[in-house]
Design a protein with these regions (language model features):
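Membrane-embedded multi-pass helical conduit in multi-pass membrane proteins
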Residues: 193-196
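Internal catalytic domains of large membrane-associated glycosyltransferases
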Residues: 1-190
């Protein structure tokens, strides 16, 4: 579908996302960030389904912390933010000629979006993150839905450990960036398993 898009930039959105008119006016400022080697610009999400109960409020709070504090730290000083899904904006011309925005496979790539970001870093690109703009997103409001999402993310991290792309990526990192990458991905789930 990337080849049918027009313009120089491409925004990836899910079906459960919404963009607001006021935020659309900020998009011009965001697109000015594509200078030099910047290939992905990410920004935060506002969970509009947080009023659906205690589980929905917990999921929205979890997403808020990941979308603001964690991604800000992953961008700088840790330098390990990749493409974590939506609503990132891509340099469309770059991703058309360098492998696309993700790598979908039914068996291996459960969390397919991170491989697009790893491809950017492997090819010398830069990932930025801005907080002055946000996009609306609806989350599951049932316990089973939230639990299923967490299982999908944890399973995707397990499959990432086995991937050839992330093996290549970690070979090009220094020691401190490698520790940051480990603790922001599979190390998070391993440390939680050890602590419980």
């Amino acid at each position: 579908a990337v080849i049918f898009a027009r313009g120089e930039c491409l925004q990836t959105l899910d079906m459960n996302q919404d963009n607001y008119m006021g935020e659309a006016f900020k998009m011009r400022n965001l697109l000015e960030g594509f200078v030099g080697e910047v290939r992905i610009i990410g920004f935060r999400e506002h969970i509009f389904s947080e009023q659906g109960g205690a589980v929905a409020n917990f999921a929205a709070s979890n997403e808020f912390v990941f979308g603001t504090i964690v991604q800000r730290w992953m961008t700088w000083p840790l330098c390990v933010r990749f493409h974590y899904g939506h609503p990132d904006v891509w340099d469309r011309l770059w991703c058309m000629s360098n492998g696309g925005v993700s790598r979908a496979s039914r068996t291996l790539h459960v969390s397919e979006d991170i491989f697009g970001g790893a491809n950017v870093i492997l090819r010398g690109g830069v990932v930025e993150y801005y907080e002055y703009i946000h996009c609306g997103k609806g989350r599951d409001i049932t316990f089973a839905g939230v639990n299923g999402f967490e299982q999908k993310i944890a399973g995707g991290n397990a499959y990432q450990i086995m991937s050839r792309d992330l093996h290549r990526l970690t070979r090009s990192m220094d020691f401190f960036r490698l520790l940051s990458f480990f603790s922001s991905g599979s190390g998070f789930y391993l440390s939680n398993a050890v602590m419980t």
